[in-house]
Amino acid sequence: MLPALAILAAALCFSTTGTAQALAGVDASPLAVGAARIVVGGGILGLLALAQRSPGRARSGSRASTAALIAVGALGVLAYQPLFFLGTRENGVAIGTVVALGSAPIATGIVDAVRLRRAPTPRWMLATAVALIGVVLVSGVTGGATALAPGGLLASAGAGMSYALYTVCGKALIERGWNSTRVMGAVFGIAAVASLPVLVLAGTSWLLTPNGLALALWLGVVTTAIAYLLFGWGLARLSAVTVSTLTLAEPLAATLLGLFVLREHLTLVSGIGLALIAVGLAVVSAPSRRREEVPDATARA
C-alpha cells in the first residue's frame, strides 16, 4: 500500500502546479515556466544522484542500451512540456489537459506491453477506463460540440506518449539494478541541462521578481524534485502501468485545490467525475492475489 501512497503523494505535488501559477500571477510564458521547473527540479535531482554511490554493474544490458534508456527518458521529459502547452493552446486548457492526461496511461500500457511482451491485466484496464471517464467529466469537455485542431490533438497525445517514455524507461533502468533516485537524477538532470537554453530564450526577467522566484522554487522543489523522488520510489515497487493510472489522481487533487484555495465552483458532472476517478484509483490500488509490488534489489534498498 505504501508504494501506491507514494505515487498518490507525487500526484498531489503535481496537482499544485496550476494553483501555484494562479496565486503567483507572474508575467511569464508557459514555456518559460515549464523550462524553469525542469532546470530547478532536474538540477536538484541530478545533484542528489551524483551524491550517491555508484550503482555498480547493472544486472543486465549493455552500457549503450542503458545510455539509450536514459537519453530516451530525458527526451520524454523535455518533450512533455512544449507538447502539452501546444495542445492546450490549440484546443483549450480543458481538452488539451484531458487528452494529455488520458492518453498517458494508455500509451504507457502500450509501450510497457511491447517491452514486456505481456498485456496489462483486465483489472488495470477496467480501473483505467473508469478513471479516464472521470477525467473527461471533471475537465468539462462534455458540453456541446467543439471544433478541434488535429495538430493540437496530436500534440496532447504526444505529451501523453512523452510521459509513457520516461516512465517506462525509468522502470527499465530500475529493473537493471539502478536506484530509483539515481534513475530520476540521470533522466531529469540531463533534461535540466538541455532546458537551460530554452529558459534563456523564453525569458528570465520574471525570475527576478519575488513571486516569480517563489513560483520557480515551488515548481522545481515540490512539483519536480520531491514529486519525482516519490514517483521513483513507487515506480521501483509497482508496475509502470499501475503507476500511470495512479497519477490520474492529479486532476482530482487539482480540482479540490481549485475549490478550497481558489474558490472555484464544482458542478454536478464534475462531482461525478471526481467520484469515478476515486473509484478507479481504489480499484487499481487494492491488493490482488498476484502482488503488483516488484521485489527487486532497488526496492529493498
Regions found by a protein language model. Give the residues of each.
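Glycine-/small-residue-enriched transmembrane alpha-helix faces in small-molecule transporters
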Residues: M1-G43, L48, P82-L83, G143-A172, ...
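Transmembrane alpha-helices of multi-pass small-molecule transport proteins
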Residues: G25-A79, S103-V111, M161-C169, M184-A202, ...
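Helix-helix packing/entry segments at the starts of transmembrane helices
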Residues: A36, G96-S103, C169-A192, T224-F260
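Specific transmembrane alpha-helical segments of multi-pass solute transporters/efflux pumps
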Residues: C13, G18, A49-G96, A100, ...
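Specific alpha-helical transmembrane segments that line the substrate/conduction pathway
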Residues: A32-G43, F84-A119, W124, A159, ...
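C-terminal-most transmembrane helix of multi-pass membrane proteins
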Residues: I38, G140, G212, L248-A301
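Hydrophobic transmembrane alpha-helices of multi-pass small-molecule transport proteins
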Residues: L45, A49, P120-T142, F188-G189, ...
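Juxtamembrane helix-entry segments on the extracytoplasmic side of multipass membrane proteins
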Residues: M1-A4, V26-A35, G61-T66, G140-S162, ...
